[in-house]
Amino acid sequence: YSLQNDPEITLIDSTIEWDEGYDVTARFLDYLNSLDAGFVAELENKTVEQLWSEYKASYGPNGQ
């Protein structure tokens, strides 16, 4: 998913939760980061590189 997939979608249904799909989560995290650049990394007190490494590792050595 890319935030640029559908630039026309700016509003979300008020019943949707932040973790209901990649698009919703991506837009929410982008919003948080727009409030304070680096917010997502600061939230975890880790660099983006560390977060990315942990994310990849969560899928195992072959991305499974």
Curated annotation (Swiss-Prot):
The prosthetic group or cofactor this protein requires is:
a divalent metal cation
Protein name from the UniProt record: Basic secretory protease
Task: Describe activation and inhibition of this protein.
Answer: Inhibited by EDTA.
- Post-translational modification remark: Glycosylated.
Name the job this protein performs: Metalloprotease, digests gelatin and azocasein (in vitro).
Q: What is its EC number?
A: 3.4.24.-
Give coiled-coil spans as residue ranges: none
Domain of life of the organism encoding this protein: Eukaryota
Q: Which GO terms describe its molecular function?
A: metal ion binding; metallopeptidase activity
Q: What is the lineage of its organism?
A: Eukaryota, Viridiplantae, Streptophyta, Embryophyta, Tracheophyta
Q: Which organism is it from?
A: Boswellia serrata (Indian frankincense)
Q: Tell me, what is an example of a GO biological process annotation in this record? A: proteolysis
Mind telling me which InterPro entries this protein's record contains? Uncharacterised_BSP
Q: Name one Pfam family in it.
A: BSP
Q: What class of enzyme is it?
A: hydrolase
Please provide the record's keywords in A-Z order. Answer: Glycoprotein, Hydrolase, Metal-binding, Metalloprotease, Protease
